């Protein structure tokens, strides 16, 4: 015991400490840039070619691709248990073999996606230019990444450097130049080239050419051409050279000032406390040496939430432990209660001792599992301790009494632990995002139960063997008097109240069975009738309010900046209002405000500090203060830990994009029929206008091809990459193109000239034309088919989202499948996760019950008694439903996990009871007397195990902090399920036992009569 305690204590520093466990990401990303290309072109030239090259590889579960302007990304979902590194190598081989990629595209990169633990963000903000801000950010990044416990530091949304050589159409005509000539001149002059070595006797002398241009002055001095008189035409005479940033629309403000973020990550062995403390210390020290007017702020600190949740779980766990000890002290001898309580510590320390070797650490899931097992691990010790105490009370000596008492319950205790483990086993195999993260629960539970079994069967009896008999004249102290009174009351209640009541129930056992069946049906009707609200993931308030406003495609960047300023101003006003209130004088309600303006999109992030701030109410105020946002295409605000997206989401796949375009209108019309459905959007909602070029007949006579026109248009508007220069740790692109003003207007296409191969200049309008077509912002594909996603929101008083989706699929789905050949329809989003989760739980829960049924059948040598053991499971579900209804909680995925946990607990009492009844019958006792005596004998341990499980969870069930809200549904399911199932164990199980005996007697009688009848019908042989 001492070794387990020491081992557990020394293992704590070895455990990873993080907010949530590391998820398993079995994905590979193939990314390829094709700058300046439209989504449709990226799809055809990049995404489709990659998909066709790799789709038949072994190990691929699913292929998804996204084609956006200038980049194509293909995501490969790897099959479970297939080696990801092997598939990555196979994909690399296939992709490298593709020779049909566009020549202007970048090389594809194939990356195995690994999870990185974000440990917060350091925000740099102040009165600096964008270049000064980035230069400072790069210095701070390099310093911070060298700190201990820090793996990766990334600059957030910092625009890459770029050298832009801008040549106007007028300059090209004035100097009779083409983009190709300027490009060739720059490439020829800006170069570093090793030229070998002069092999001298004294040693080699390296020959180097150093003409690489690195900054604006270097490029401006490049000679484009010179005449015979020596007069030179410099690049500065023809073009404007701008040493600037890539043309990306992004502008970040933090607390009203220009800002840049440093994201801090840890890749392996995360320790949220050590890492964040290191970063905080570095920030405090480094801020002292920053330029005037520049500040650092460490925020989005995960250690804050981690500490708060650890504090909540530990305090509630200790509170539950105290309540458990109090309950034990009220009914058991102090020494017995003490050693039973020590069993909890031993089980926990043993679990901590082995936990590092299971791949689990200390996080919200594993800590909650410890809390969950608080009332479970004590059950074995209570049953063994009570049995030993009873044996010793009958006059058996200490050691002999301990052996006899332990042997009497060893079978039900062992099978109870095994059955509980089997019921928790499905959590090892849960699908979806939360599957791998939930493994901490069964790992902790199984380890704790294993050590609890060792402690209760080996360690506890050895302690109880030396417990002195209770004195004939008990101590007159208040504790003894209280314990004797409680124990006496419980014994009298069992004999004088419970036993007569049970006898009446047994004489009317059929009616008792019908009564419990009605209760079960009532609870199922309560759930199925919609009286209980459900949500796959409970909405739990976060420390942040996140706002996103999407503007119409093609709008000016100034519109995004104006919208960002509008959101920030509204947030600042609310911040001032809240922080001026008296209750927030010590701790402000709102701290930091981040506003990001991007291309047609604005993001707002508001950090709350005070625990008692209602972020839901604050979000409503923020939304109302913004007023009319009709000019926005989409507005979303979220204040929860996990944004589930819209509750209705349907995914359609087809090889015909025209079919999907028409289908999008059909789906909208179908959803609009349901009351309460609003804000219907689809992935074709955001059209992107495209200019499509075509040649005129005159072009052929001039020898101009469509390729010539396309290339020169690309050079003018997107630009041509001349070279890349290494500078300040990154590759800087050097681009030649039109000035920004000429690239902003469509009319400039008509005014530009196309150069022929013989040097002639022809107006664009003479040889080509263009038309405006509607394209897409992005094109999504699933398993080599284009997809359409339609999503919608549902009002609180509307129909359940799942019911709406199922109705649409049932009524409209067959029509769409017939109308659009090759169409596939799937649920998507949280609804799909919910269905997969429920199906997995039903399947694996049923499998667990079959396994337990088989184990019980072997143990009891009966097929009826295992059924009696498992009757507790549906009635545990009944208790969970009534618990959610009484306390007003939504049924969520955690509620279902609580029901599974409850199932593993409630069968234990049935096992103990049935085993005792069987022993009494083996001793020759009449069935009715055995039922009454066995239930009375096991009344105290059954009540104690149920009450300790319940009271151990009461503190977390009554917790009001945000940190506990998403765990309470599981606690409600377990605690109320155990309490309701206790009544089933003490009343229904004996009644069903008797009913089974009646059925057995009836079947025996019927069989006997059939045998007698068949014997009479046999014709006697002729003599």
Across the structure, where does each feature detected by a protein language model lie?
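Flexible hinge/switch segments at interdomain interfaces of large molecular machines
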Residues: 17-28, 64-70, 105-126, 154-160, ...
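Signature of alpha-helical transmembrane segments and their immediate interfacial
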Residues: 1-17, 409, 421, 478-535, ...
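Extracytoplasmic/periplasmic membrane-proximal domains and adjacent transmembrane bundles
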Residues: 31, 73, 99, 143-322, ...
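Short helix-loop junctions at transmembrane helix boundaries
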Residues: 18-21, 302, 352-368, 428-445, ...
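Hydrophobic transmembrane alpha-helices and their membrane-interface caps
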Residues: 8-11, 322-389, 854-938, 943-959, ...
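Helix-loop junctions and hydrophobic alpha-helical segments within the transmembrane domains
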Residues: 299, 306, 310, 385, ...
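Transmembrane alpha-helices and their membrane-interface boundaries in multi-pass membrane transporters
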Residues: 374-388, 410-429, 436-484, 604, ...
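Extracytoplasmic/periplasmic
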Residues: 6-100, 105-108, 130-157, 534-607, ...
């Amino acid at each position: 015991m001492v070794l387990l305690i020491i081992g557990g204590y020394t293992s704590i520093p070895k455990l990873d400490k993080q907010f949530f466990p590391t998820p398993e990401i079995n994905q590979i990303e193939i990314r390829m840039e094709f700058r300046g290309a439209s989504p449709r072109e990226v799809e055809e030239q990049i995404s489709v070619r990659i998909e066709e090259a790799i789709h038949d590889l072994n190990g691929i579960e699913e292929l998804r691709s996204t084609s956006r302007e200038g980049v194509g990304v293909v995501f490969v979902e790897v099959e479970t248990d297939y080696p990801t590194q092997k598939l990555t190598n196979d994909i690399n081989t296939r992709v490298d073999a593709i020779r049909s990629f566009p020549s202007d595209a970048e090389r594809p990169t194939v990356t195995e996606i690994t999870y990185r633990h974000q440990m917060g963000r350091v925000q740099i903000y102040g009165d600096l230019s964008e270049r000064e801000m980035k230069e400072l950010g790069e210095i701070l990044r390099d310093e911070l990444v060298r700190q201990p416990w820090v793996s990766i530091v990334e600059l957030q949304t910092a625009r890459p450097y770029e050298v832009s050589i801008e040549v106007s159409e007028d300059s090209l005509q004035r100097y009779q130049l083409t983009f190709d000539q300027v490009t060739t001149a720059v490439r020829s002059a800006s170069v570093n080239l090793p030229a070998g070595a002069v092999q001298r006797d004294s040693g080699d002398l390296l020959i180097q050419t150093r003409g690489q241009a690195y900054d604006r002055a270097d490029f401006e001095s490049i000679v484009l051409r010179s005449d015979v008189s020596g007069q030179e035409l410099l690049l500065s005479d023809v073009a404007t050279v701008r040493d600037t940033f890539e043309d990306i629309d992004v502008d970040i403000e933090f607390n009203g000032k220009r800002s840049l973020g440093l994201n801090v990550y840890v890749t392996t062995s995360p320790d949220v406390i050590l890492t964040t403390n290191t970063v905080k210390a570095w920030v405090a020290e480094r801020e002292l040496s920053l330029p005037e007017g520049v500040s650092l702020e460490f925020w989005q600190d995960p250690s804050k939430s981690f500490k708060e949740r650890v504090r909540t779980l530990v305090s509630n766990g200790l509170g539950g432990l105290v309540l458990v000890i109090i309950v034990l002290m009220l009914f058991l001898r102090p020494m017995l209660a003490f050693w039973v309580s020590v069993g909890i510590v031993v089980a926990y320390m043993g679990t901590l001792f082995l936990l590092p070797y299971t791949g689990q650490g200390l996080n919200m899931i594993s800590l909650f599992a410890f809390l969950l097992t608080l009332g479970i691990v004590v059950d074995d010790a209570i049953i063994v301790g009570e049995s030993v105490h009873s044996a010793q009370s009958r006059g058996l000596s200490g050691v002999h009494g301990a052996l006899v008492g332990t042997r009497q319950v060893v079978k039900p205790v062992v099978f109870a632990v095994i059955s509980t483990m089997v019921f928790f086993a499905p959590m090892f195999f849960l699908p979806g995002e939360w599957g791998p993260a939930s493994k901490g629960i069964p790992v902790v539970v199984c380890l704790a139960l294993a050590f609890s079994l060792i402690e209760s069967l080996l360690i506890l009896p050895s302690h109880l063997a030396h417990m002195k008999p209770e004195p004939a004249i008990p101590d007159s102290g208040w504790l003894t008097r209280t314990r004797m009174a409680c124990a006496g009351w419980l014994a009298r209640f069992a004999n004088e109240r419970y036993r007569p009541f049970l006898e009446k129930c047994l004489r009317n056992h059929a009616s008792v069975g019908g009564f419990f069946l009605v209760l079960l049906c009532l609870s199922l009707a309560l759930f199925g009738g919609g009286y209980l609200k459900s949500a796959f993931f409970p909405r739990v308030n976060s420390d942040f309010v996140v706002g996103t406003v999407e503007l119409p495609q093609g709008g000016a960047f100034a519109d995004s900046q104006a919208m960002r300023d509008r959101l920030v101003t509204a947030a600042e006003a609310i911040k001032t209002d809240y922080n001026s209130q008296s209750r927030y004088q010590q701790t402000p309600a709102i701290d930091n405000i981040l506003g990001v303006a991007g291309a047609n999109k604005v993001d707002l992030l508001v950090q709350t500090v005070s625990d008692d701030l209602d972020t839901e109410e604050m979000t409503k105020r923020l939304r109302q203060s913004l007023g009319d946002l009709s000019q926005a295409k989409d507005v979303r605000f979220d204040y929860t830990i996990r944004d589930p997206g819209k509750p209705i989401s349907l995914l359609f796949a087809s090889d015909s994009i025209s079919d999907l375009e028409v289908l999008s209108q059909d789906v909208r019309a179908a959803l609009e029929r349901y009351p309460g459905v609003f804000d219907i959007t689809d992935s074709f909602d955001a059209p992107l206008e495209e200019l499509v070029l075509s040649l005129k007949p005159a072009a052929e006579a001039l020898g101009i091809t469509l390729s010539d026109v396309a290339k020169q248009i690309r050079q003018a508007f997107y630009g041509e990459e001349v070279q890349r220069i290494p500078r300040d740790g990154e590759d800087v692109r050097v681009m030649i193109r039109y000035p920004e003003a000429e690239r902003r207007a469509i009319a400039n296409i008509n005014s530009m000239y196309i150069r022929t191969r013989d040097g002639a200049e022809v107006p664009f309008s003479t040889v080509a034309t263009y038309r405006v077509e509607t394209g897409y912002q992005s094109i999504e594909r699933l398993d080599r088919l284009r997809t359409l996603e339609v999503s919608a929101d549902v009002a609180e008083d509307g129909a359940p989202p799942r019911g709406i989706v199922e109705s649409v699929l049932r009524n409209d789905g067959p029509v769409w499948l017939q109308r659009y050949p090759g169409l596939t329809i799937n649920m998507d989003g949280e609804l799909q996760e919910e269905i997969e989760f429920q199906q997995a739980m039903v399947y694996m829960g049923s499998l667990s019950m079959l396994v337990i049924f088989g184990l019980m059948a072997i143990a009891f040598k009966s097929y009826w008694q295992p059924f009696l053991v498992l009757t507790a499971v549906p009635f545990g579900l009944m208790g969970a439903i009534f618990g959610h209804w009484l306390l007003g909680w939504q049924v969520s995925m955690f509620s279902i996990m609580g029901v599974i946990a409850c199932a593993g607990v409630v069968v234990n009492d049935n096992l103990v009871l049935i085993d005792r009844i069987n022993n009494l019958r083996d001793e020759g006792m009449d069935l009715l007397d055995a039922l009454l005596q066995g239930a009375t004998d096991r009344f105290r341990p059954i009540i104690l195990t149920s009450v300790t499980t319940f009271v151990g969870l009461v503190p977390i069930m009554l917790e009001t902090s945000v940190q506990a809200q998403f765990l309470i549904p599981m606690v409600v399911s377990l605690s109320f399920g155990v309490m309701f199932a206790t009544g089933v164990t003490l009343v229904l199980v004996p009644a069903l036992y008797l009913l089974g005996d009646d059925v057995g007697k009836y079947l025996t009688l019927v069989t006997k009569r059939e045998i007698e009848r068949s014997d009479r019908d046999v014709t006697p042989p002729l003599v």
